[in-house]
Amino acid sequence: MEHRIVGPGPYRATRLWNETVELFRAKMPLRKHRCRFKSYEHCFTAAEAVDWLHELLRCSQNFGPEVTRKQTVQLLKKFLKNHVIEDIKGKWGEEDFEDNRHLYRFPPSSPLKPYPKKPPNQKDVIKFPEWNDLPPGTSQENIPVRPVVMNSEMWYKRHSIAIGEVPACRLVHRRQLTEANVEEIWKSMTLSYLQKILGLDSLEEVLDVKLVNSKFIIHNVYSVSKQGVVILDDKSKELPHWVLSAMKCLANWPNCSDLKQPMYLGFEKDVFKTIADYYGHLKEPLLTFHLFDAFVSVLGLLQKEKVAVEAFQICCLLLPPENRRKLQLLMRMMARICLNKEMPPLCDGFGTRTLMVQTFSRCILCSKDEVDLDELLAARLVTFLMDNYQEILKVPLALQTSIEERVAHLRRVQIKYPGADMDITLSAPSFCRQISPEEFEYQRSYGSQEPLAALLEEVITDAKLSNKEKKKKLKQFQKSYPEVYQERFPTPESAALLFPEKPKPKPQLLMWALKKPFQPFQRTRSFRM
């Protein structure tokens, strides 16, 4: 029963559902059964399905050995409701599956859940703000553009530290960062860090970036107690006093210093039920609805424990401060109860650890749309949280240091050297305006021809080049930029004028003829007939 590991990424809950359905349909043993004097081929009992699927889920690294038989029954109810299975008479659509001898079978085709389609042309790119970003509402026609010029000579001037080579300088203060600038830096760098850990090209399919509040991140980093628990500014969002007292009682059992009334038999069970009722009636899970896909995506990294812890750290920073505080106090209580050997059993049917996971998993992680695997996924996440809550709910120091250094760099005083590239970059900014597509095409076609034409003239007028070298360069230029060349030399004759023909030298007298002495005239006899 091999179960492929479903890694992080968008629609992980849907991918897990389809993976489990395919394995269940492909490998669930089918055989002949009798019921009420009738025989049915290729079917299975409810108990057989629970046994087989429970073992599959426990052996899967996507869910883990903490999956209970009750959770397996809940999943089979979802299977029956979604027509993954049907009873022997073909009935389906309701969650009336029970762990008994009732017969079920597979329908001819099993509907796999479709993946949501990505809206076209919608990309939520994480924007890294710069120190000179203009506030919202600035006209698009007056967007400052800083020209950047750098060459080897300027680089040498800025970086030379030899004695006597440092020119006079003066201090330049950067523009004051606003609170909105700092908040945007925290948000963009935090999301970029999370995207890098998850190994995704974009966070848009696992997280709505617009719902991320940068103020929450900053508050969760700096407004903490010595124990690392978030301190709330708004005390009305605190846990009720009676809930906090009940949690302290169980966390410090049996040393309950806050309790003045005497304890009775089963007192700890009533206290636990009080806490469970409060968390169970929250309007939204502690990890919030809009972060559900992000946390489920991180579950695909549990095989790499260190990476998963870092990813959970970042995700928990995105929580509202009141949610993060409630989660911190709850996880501390759950972990202490599980480690407390003096704590009496809080439930006769379950162990303490299993009880904690089953009781609080739904109030910690839950989807708004009731994903069919959310109970199993929540149990998996809560189990990992209990084992690593001290690290997960700490502020990630690497991220904090990186962002603080970035902000400090943008606020830092800089040294300005006369004549260096700093003089150019800090000069009065030029401005740009939006142009039409036709004007853009014209500029793209003809705007680059001016420097090329200047280059061509430089080749033509270069006296250091021989005619042979000049002809070679002109031939290369004509091949690379025929339009510019054609404009300069519209006809072959105009190009030929650059290389006028040299006058042909006069033929010289044959020297050998001059060296021979003149022969005297000799008379010859005429042969006359």
From Swiss-Prot:
It comes from Homo sapiens (Human). Pfam families: DEP (PF00610), RhoGAP (PF00620). The gene is DEPDC1B. InterPro entries: DEP_dom, Rho_GTPase_activation_prot, RhoGAP_dom, WH-like_DNA-bd_sf, WH_DNA-bd_sf. The record marks I231 as: Arginine finger. The keyword Phosphoprotein applies. Keywords: GTPase activation, Phosphoprotein. SMART domains: DEP. One of its GO terms (molecular function) is GTPase activator activity. It comes from the Eukaryota. One of its GO terms (biological process) is intracellular signal transduction. The modification Phosphoserine is found at S160, S436. Residues 24-108 form the DEP domain. PANTHER family: DEP DOMAIN-CONTAINING (PTHR16206), DEP DOMAIN-CONTAINING PROTEIN 1B (PTHR16206:SF11). The lineage of its organism: Eukaryota, Metazoa, Chordata, Craniata, Vertebrata. The keyword Phosphoprotein applies. Residues 201-393 form the Rho-GAP domain. This is DEP domain-containing protein 1B.
